[in-house]
Design a protein with these regions (language model features):
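Extracytosolic ligand-binding ectodomains
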Residues: 1-250
């Protein structure tokens, strides 16, 4: 058995040299494209979170959504899921990609944000602003990307008071929670397991709270110990009743 941390990049490398994986691989990846025989993906499925938050956004009355992302595999995966979900529900949408060149040039970045918002200099003196082009914005990029973009969106009249901001569980990070321009963002997340005793013990030993991957690593180590006592690995891993772990049921 091969146990994580085996993330998406490593899985891709394994697939390039091995056609048929014969031993069980318990991976930390959450990339559904990498599903395979004998490979189990145990990371949080970000695509599911995107579908949940879109459903919520539609219920709040969003009719036109801007999907904003960057030119990365992570962002493209979420954009693909969001676009498919919105088209199936008949919601008007625009996909807006920020290239690395634009993100690294403050002048180009400002210009693109102004173009998206329809901002004009004369709006600064108006008490009542024109209706925004979008009633919702879905962020699909990294934390760094979102932190670079959000203050500019806010400055150019696409702030969270005028437009509904949506995101996934990335928004639980302290970086995004503490960013003033992102206050009022709605985001989806899987339920955190109720494991106070484990967390308290972890803090006593290590002086900090365990991350999701720390909890998952603990689960996998314990699982491997149990698995070593089984004759048929595959049958045990895929048993009907599943497995109850600290990080959730699998």
């Amino acid at each position: 058995i091969l146990i994580g941390p085996v993330f998406s990049k490593k899985l891709s490398e394994i697939y390039q040299v091995v056609d048929h994986i014969k031993i069980p691989v318990l991976s930390f990846s959450n990339n559904k494209k990498l599903k395979n025989n004998n490979v189990w993906l145990l990371g949080k499925m970000q695509e599911d979170e995107i579908e949940y938050i879109i459903d919520f956004g539609i219920k709040t009355g969003i009719n036109k959504l801007a999907i904003i992302g960057e030119n990365t595999e992570y962002s493209k995966t979420l954009i693909f899921t969001a676009k498919k979900t919105l088209l199936n529900k008949g919601i008007d949408l625009d996909v807006i990609i920020f290239e690395k060149e634009t993100l690294n040039d403050r002048s180009k970045l400002r210009h693109k944000v102004k173009k998206i918002s329809g901002w004009k200099k004369e709006f600064k003196n108006k008490l009542i602003l024109p209706k925004p082009r979008y009633d919702g914005i879905l962020f699909t990029g990294s934390n760094e990307f979102i932190l670079k973009l959000a203050p500019l969106l806010s400055y150019y009249d696409l702030n969270s008071d005028r437009v509904t901001y949506l995101g996934n569980s990335n928004f639980k990070s302290s970086q995004l929670v503490n960013e003033l321009s992102l206050q009022g963002t709605f985001f989806s997340s899987s339920n955190d397991p109720k494991i106070d005793e484990f967390k308290n013990e972890w803090r006593e030993n290590w002086g900090l709270s365990p991350s999701y991957f720390s909890i998952l690593a603990y689960d996998l180590a314990l699982f491997a110990k149990k698995l070593s006592l089984e004759k048929d690995f595959s049958n045990y891993i895929t048993r009907t009743q599943g497995h109850k772990w600290l990080s959730g049921e699998v």
